Curated annotation (Swiss-Prot):
Disulfide bonds join 57-78, 64-83, 68-85. Inhibits voltage-gated potassium channel. This is Potassium channel toxin Meg-beta-KTx1. Residues 1-19 form the signal peptide. GO terms for cellular component: extracellular region. It is found in: Secreted. Residues 20-27 form a propeptide. It comes from Mesobuthus gibbosus. PROSITE patterns: BSPN_CSAB. Keywords: Disulfide bond, Ion channel impairing toxin, Neurotoxin, Potassium channel impairing toxin, Secreted, Signal, Toxin. One of its GO terms (molecular function) is toxin activity. Residues 54-91 form the BetaSPN-type CS-alpha/beta domain. Coiled coil: none annotated. The keyword Transmembrane helix does not apply.
Amino acid sequence: MQRNLVVLLFLGMVALSSCGLREKHFQKLVKYAVPEGTLRTIIQTAVHKLGKTQFGCPAYQGYCDDHCQDIKKQEGFCHGFKCKCGIPMGF
């Protein structure tokens, strides 16, 4: 039952995030929907980690460049799931 709830919450968060809702909205939803305990802590941690990622980075080649040009007027590079402005990949 708890696994189904977690999957349902995750899919709901993914669907709502495409509508422009931010991490704080999801944290509030988790706070009221999930009882206090270990499960809530795990879900809140997952929401925070997902909120920090930029999924367009690996999926769309020019996402980071467009993102960094808008913000800092620098060239953008994809580092995993995060865009870094002006910091090239160092292998």
